[in-house]
C-alpha cells in the first residue's frame, strides 16, 4: 500500500433532493486503482451526497493505511468549504463537514484539489452505477 493516495469523490442526486448516491476511486501515486465504490444513500440533496462521498472515500483511504491523501472533486462548494474559503451555513452540511474534518484529521496530510467535471469521470461512474442499480 502506498502511503500517499489520490482520492476522487463525487456525489449526485436525481432530483434535488432525490434518490442520491456517492462514488469514489482511490489510486496510488502510480495510478494503480486501490479501491472504488458507489453506494446509494436514500433521498438527499446533491451537496449531502458530495459530502457523504468525501467521508466514504476518506474512510476507505484510512482503511487502506494511507497517510497522505490528495482529494480531487468537481464540487466547488465541497472543495471551498473544506479548505475554508467558503463558510458552512447549512446545518445539515455543517454536521457532514465536521465529520469529514474529523476523518481527515487522522491523516498526516490532506490536500484538496478542485477539478473540472470531465476529470472526475470514474467517481461519477460509481455514482451512476449505484443509482442505476437501485432504480425500479
State what each model feature region is.
Residues 12-16, 55-135:
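RNase H catalytic domain
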Amino acid at each position: 500500500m502506498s502511503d500517499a493516495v489520490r482520492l476522487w469523490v463525487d456525489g449526485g442526486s436525481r432530483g434535488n433532493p432525490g434518490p442520491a448516491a456517492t462514488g469514489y476511486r482511490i489510486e496510488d501515486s502510480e495510478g494503480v486503482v486501490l479501491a472504488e465504490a458507489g453506494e446509494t444513500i436514500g433521498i438527499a440533496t446533491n451537496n449531502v451526497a458530495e459530502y457523504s462521498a468525501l467521508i466514504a472515500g476518506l474512510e476507505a483511504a484510512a482503511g487502506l493505511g494511507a497517510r497522505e491523501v490528495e482529494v480531487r472533486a468537481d464540487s466547488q462548494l465541497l472543495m471551498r468549504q473544506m479548505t475554508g474559503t467558503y463558510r458552512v451555513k447549512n446545518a445539515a452540511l455543517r454536521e457532514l463537514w465536521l465529520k469529514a474534518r474529523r476523518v481527515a484529521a487522522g491523516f498526516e496530510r490532506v490536500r484538496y484539489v478542485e477539478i473540472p467535471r470531465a476529470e472526475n469521470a470514474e467517481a461519477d461512474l460509481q455514482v451512476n452505477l449505484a443509482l442505476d442499480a437501485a432504480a425500479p
